[in-house]
Amino acid sequence: MAKLKGGFQEGAIGRQPHYDTLKDALEKSKKEGSTFKEVDTERDNVLNILNELVPTFKDLKAYDDSKAYMNDGGAKGKELAAKYVAQVEKFDADYAKFNDALIKANTEQTKKQIEKLKKTVKKGYAAVMESTLRLTTLVENVEKAPKNADKQAVEKELNEIQILLKSINNDRGEVLVNSYNSVVGSVRQVLTDANENNLNDMIENFNNYIESYNNTTPDQFDSK
């Protein structure tokens, strides 16, 4: 992308993402329908820019593959590259909004599921779902703006999540608590020094926690 921002460069377009694949997937999801108005709206905005972006990508790729730049000194390539870069920047902004809408919808659905589980015998599973949801939000917020994080609020949330996890009184709960403790340590490191290594460690430990969570069936969190 950086090379294309400077104008047309031979071969640069070939290293760009395949936006046509995403376009096909979103069109398929649109046909299947959705119950979330905000998600639908943001998805349609992404599709609108993809309808402009994909043809530009194909034009630039064809121009590059045919070596037409040898005939016009790259003039059309510069024009297409500028058009492509502008469309990608708009796509990035629209896709970020779409992703936020998806996260919001998924979070709302998860919260509803947690409340239902709390009223059943699946209290351990409810606790781990709530813990994981809250931890995901915390890690995402710290990653986005580590230097602006409210350390006191983060510590309070970490302690509350730990209490929830420790309410799962079986070996699977212990495994998750151990994995969680690694996340806690790395989050605190980021709050002390938000360098790239510490941020990477936090994400790695969080991913390990999610892996432990995914490797456990719901019933195991309520087994004796």
Regions of interest found by a model, annotated:
Residues H18-A25, I49-E52, T56, D94, ...:
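Amphipathic, well-ordered alpha-helical segments in soluble domains
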Residues G77-Y180:
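Extended amphipathic alpha-helical interaction segments
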Residues N45, I49-E52, T56-Y63, A127, ...:
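Solvent-exposed, amphipathic alpha-helical segments
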Residues K58-E89, E196-I203:
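Polar/charged, Q/E/K-enriched amphipathic alpha-helical segments with strong coiled-coil propensity
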Residues M1-G74:
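N-terminal Sec/ER secretory leader and immediately downstream segment
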Residues K156-K224:
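A cross-kingdom marker for long, charged
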Residues K61-D72, I103-I114, F221:
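Structured alpha-helical bundle/scaffold domains in large eukaryotic membrane-trafficking regulators
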Residues T41-D44, N48-N51, P55-K58, A82-E89, ...:
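Solvent-exposed, polar/charged alpha-helical surfaces in well-ordered, non-transmembrane soluble domains
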